[in-house]
Amino acid sequence: MLRQLFLASLLVAVPAVCGAQGSDSAPIRPFTIRVPDAVLADLKARLANARYPDALQGDGWTYGTDVRYLKALVDYWRNTFDWRAQERRLNQLEQFTTQIDGLNVHFIHRRSKQPNALPLLITHGWPGSFVEFTKIIGPLTDPAAHGGRPEDAFDLVLPSIPGFAFSDKPREAGYDPVRIAATEAKLMARLGYQRYGVQGGDWGAIIGTQVARNDAAHVAGLHLNMCTAPPPAGVDSSAGLSESERARLKVRDRFQAEETGYQQIQGTKPQTLGFALND
């Protein structure tokens, strides 16, 4: 758990220089994660000088992060976590960048040895990154080596959403899931794929749905591990439900009332939060 948190926290890298070409004139460049020593030293100094707020006695996670947990996390991050080891591990993956609509887009591209493998575009969510898919790259691209059937193999394309990991952040407002989906469809075309599958969860599910909707001529199928179906406006969501189902709705309502503060600030004033997190 702690290791996964830190993999998404160091976002400075230097791309390799030479690259391959896709199906159009825009270059596709190999990418290597290479965080400068000075960045790591600065991080260690910030962690060493971390200041912790006073906490209410016994509040735990009621009002946000438990300060005891935070202190343990910082201690692990500063004294135990080995970024260079993770860097070496991640650099074993086939990483690339390419410019689409003015943004450098980072992605993993693993081709299967099977000649008829179906290309599969998988998009992560928040707070995530391409790292969450590293354990499935082998089984999906080479199922025979993991007890599966060779004909079930996929070519994998795992992009980093703009603003995540090593993809450039958007430089203008309004870069919504529809625009991100268009970027991903262009990426698949640039890689030469005319027919491909789409998978996603969390924001990846929302983006993936838009890819399937707006690039339907090329999308063979869509798989989601987050499916939402809110009732139409003006419809009583509890109508016709059993008592146990109504109880679950109350759990949802309580979660929305007490546990979605992050949605409010990120959805309205992300810049303010960004200043604090960046420092």
Where are these regions (language model features)?
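Short coil/turn linker and secondary-structure boundary residues
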Residues: 35-38, 65, 175, 268, ...
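N-terminal targeting or regulatory segments adjacent to alpha/beta-hydrolase or S9 domains
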Residues: 2-89
